[in-house]
Every structure is written in C-alpha cells, then in structure tokens.
Regions:
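Short aromatic-glycine-(Arg/Gly/Cys) micro-motifs in beta-strand/loop hairpins
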Residues: 1-19
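A short, charged, amphipathic alpha-helix used as a generic interaction element across diverse proteins
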Residues: 11-13, 24-52
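Short, mixed-charge low-complexity intrinsically disordered segments
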Residues: 38-88
C-alpha cells in the first residue's frame, strides 16, 4: 500500500488563485501550516497594525480573519489553510 501525499493549500479572499505545497507526512504539512500562519500573522500585524483572529473551520481547515481597508475599500479578509491527503 502506498503512502498518501499531504497537500497544504493556502488561499486568500483578497488574492486571486491559491498556493499548494506537497508534504510526505501529515505532521510535516501541519507544521508548515503553523509556520505559514505565523508568517502571515506577522505580516498582517506589521502592515495593518492589527491582530487577525484564528477560526478553526474543521479538523483540516483553519482561517485567519481580519478587517482592513485595501484599495480604499473596507473588507474582511480570510486566509484559509487546508491540508488534504492525496492517495497515489
């Protein structure tokens, strides 16, 4: 039996598209997700001078949510991180 590949997907409501990164284990995918969330949180705090809230959507999906003025528009931004197992 082959081992699955774990895919970490990051998508943001204020950006087009998404990024996907493969990992050999579930643990490594979630560790990368934590680092990515820390990096995004630091960028949000530096850029917008506010702290995003974290929302656990499901066991495999987490969101950072913050309200900001982007291009002169008030908007709620959601950055979603998801980990999926893909069987080969």
């Amino acid at each position: 039996m082959t081992k699955p590949t774990y895919i970490l997907i990051r998508e943001s409501s204020n950006e087009s598209g998404y990024t996907a990164h493969p990992f050999p284990t579930e643990t490594s995918a979630y560790a990368a997700m934590d680092r990515m969330m820390e990096s995004d949180t630091a960028a949000i705090e530096t850029t917008y001078h506010l702290s995003p809230r974290v929302e656990q959507v499901s066991s495999y999906k987490t969101q950072l949510i913050f309200d900001a003025i982007i291009a002169e528009s008030d908007m709620t931004v959601k950055i979603t991180y998801s980990v999926y197992a893909i069987d080969k």
